[in-house]
Amino acid sequence: CKLMLKNYKVQAYFINEVGSPEFNHQFNYAKKIELNLEKIDFDNLKSIEFSGVIIDCIFGIGLNREIKGKYLKLINLVNSLKKKIISIDTPSGISADTYLSSSHIISDKVLTFHVPKLTFFFSEYIDKIKNVEILDIGLDNSEYKRMEGVGELIDINIIAKKYKPRKKTIHKGDCGHALLFAGSEGKYGASILCGKSLFRSGAGLLTFLCDEKMKEFIYKSLPEAMTYDIITKDNFSISSKIKKYRVIGIGPGLGMSKRVIENFKMILNESNYPVVVDADGLNILSKDKNLFEKLPKESILTPHIGEFKRFAGNFENSNEKIILQRRISKKY
């Protein structure tokens, strides 16, 4: 209606003349201002072909079933026209929070309201939903913040809340001491990348738990880092010191040798602080799920899909993946 009032040539198509109270109100308003309205003839959809831009409002965010029959025919036709398509709230055929395997509108732009929808981040859709613009429609933020979601979108606002300004008199001893257990022969680069990231994120001190060969790479790439020999049965001296490390990173390029597994278990037994587990650290957990019970509180796991399936089990779609992830998080 607003486009017509701005002198755009608009043709609106509707499926039913009666719907929800909101639909009825808008439909009556459209008739009142004499918007060009036409009921869709599913047996003759050719009139849509002459559109320059298509605004998609066939279905809303409440959709919870597969698209079939005449609606599927309509969606496939719209996609085949290769016109510029703008979807409102979500492309028709895509639910706000549930994966549906049927066809959906492939939009050039999505104008969604208040917040991005969960499905926008599903692997099945993320490459197909393009150019999302979030519009403020005046919803009550206080009510919205009390609602429980399935996750939290990490953006600059979240990061800004975690930022702690540093005093001018601060020194490295005030900024935490991290332990990194990563890298093995042929994969030392993984540990170096992790070490650089730790320093970049603000760690004051960093110690690598590593073998003799790896030390040379560390001293050349990160001379400010310290090293400690990987533990053997003859040398468990570091186990008593594990408690001093404020965070421990485990896994990238680590391998799964017997000695690595022994050190991994020792860290979980001794640490009082969170651990970040990635790569081979996750593979070790997958081999011995009893180790999940020993993960310190607020530990973080960072699996890719293959690693996740090894310890969580298989899933068919993103909905099942989220259910598995939440179940494991609550359990451990």
State where each predicted segment sits.
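Nucleotide and nucleotide-moiety/phosphate-recognizing core
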Residues: 1-57, 66-88, 263, 271, ...
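Small-residue (G/A/S/T)-rich helix-start motifs and N-terminal tracts that mark the onset
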Residues: 1-17, 49, 109, 120-275, ...
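Glycine-rich, charge-decorated loop segments at or immediately adjacent to ligand/cofactor-binding or catalytic sites
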Residues: 24, 91-105, 282-295
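Short, structured secondary-structure boundary patches
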Residues: 31-36, 60-61, 225-232
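Short gly/ser/thr-rich secondary-structure transition/capping motifs
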Residues: 35-42, 68, 91-96, 159-164, ...
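Internal gly/pro-rich beta-alpha loop/helix module
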Residues: 52-53, 58-149
